[in-house]
Amino acid sequence: MTYSFDLTVVWALVIAFAVFAYIVMDGFDLGIGLLFPVLRPGTERDTAMNSVAPVWDGNETWLVLGGGGLFAVFPLAYAVILPALYAPIIAMLLGLIFRGVAFEFRWRDPRHRAAWDVAFAGGSLVAALAQGITLGALLQGIAVEGRAYAGGWWDWLTPFSVLVGASLVVGYALLGATWLVMRTEGLLQAQARRYALRLTAATVTAIALVSAVTPFLQGRYYERWLAMPNVLVTAQVPLLVALAAYALWRTLRGGAERAPFLIALGLFALTFLGLGISIFPDVVPGRITIWQAAAPEASQIFLLAGASVLIPIILSYTAYAYWVFRGKVDAHGYH
C-alpha cells in the first residue's frame, strides 16, 4: 500500500514526542527530589512533595510509551541499545523504584521519614544521572557489527557521558526549582527562586560544554553543526538558547511565577531540538537509521492505529489532572 507519508518517520516523531514529554514532565518531579537535601525537613519538604503528588506517577506513563514504542517499532535498535546500556538503564529503573517507594512510605511511616527522604533524594539523583549518562553514551556512539552490539560492558562510561549525566541533573534541578516558584508561595517560593537563578547559570554552562564537545564526537555531527552552509541554520539554536536563558533570568529576577517554568521547558525543547539535529535520521548514531531498525510496515500500521487512540487519551487525562490540581499548594494539600 502506498502512503503520502513515511510511516517510519511518523513513528520516530511519536517516540521522540513521548521521550520529550517524559523528560519535561518527570524532569521536574526528579528535580524536586534533587532539591530535597536543601529544603528544610517538615513544612518545606511536605509542600514540595504535595506540589507533585497528584501527577508524578502519571508522568512516568510517557517513559513506558517511549520504551514500549522503541521495542515494538524499532526492534533492531532496541536489541542493540539495550545490551550496550544495560548498566545505566538498570540504575535508572532502580532509582525510579526507590524514588516511588520513598514517595509513598515517607507519609505512612513518619518514624523513619528521614530515611525515606534520603531514599527519595538518592533515587532521584541516580535516575537523573543514569538518564543523562545513557543519552551521552548513545550520542558518543555504540559499537555495532552486523546487527548486534559489539562493544564491552563499560563502553558507556566515558568523560562525555558523565558530563551529559551531570548536565541533566542540573537541568532537572532547574525544572524542579521553577516548578516550586510556580506552585508555592512565601519563604519556600523565595528560596526556590534563588536556587533557580543559580541553576540557570549552571544549566547554561552545562549546555555550552556539551554543545562544544558534541560536534567533535563524530564527523557527521561536525558537518551538521559547523560546516557551511549548515551552520547558517543550526547557529539559530544556540542563539535561541541564549535568548531563552536571558528571558529566564529576567523573569526570575522580576518576580514572575509561571513564566520561569514555561521558559525552562522551552530551554529543554531547544536542547531536544539540538539532539534531533545531531542524530536524525539515525536511531543508533552513525550505525543504524530508523528505516534499517524499523519493524515491518504491517506492524507499524497496526501499532499506529492503537497509538492514535491511546495518545489522545493519555494527553486528555494528563491535562485534566494538571487542571484539577492547579494553583498553589501547602504542606497539607494532598496527603
Please place each PLM-identified region on the residue numbering.
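Helix-coil boundary and interhelical linker segments in multi-pass alpha-helical membrane proteins
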Residues: 1-13, 71-86, 139-159
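Alpha-helical transmembrane segments
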Residues: 11-22, 82-94, 121-125, 155-169, ...
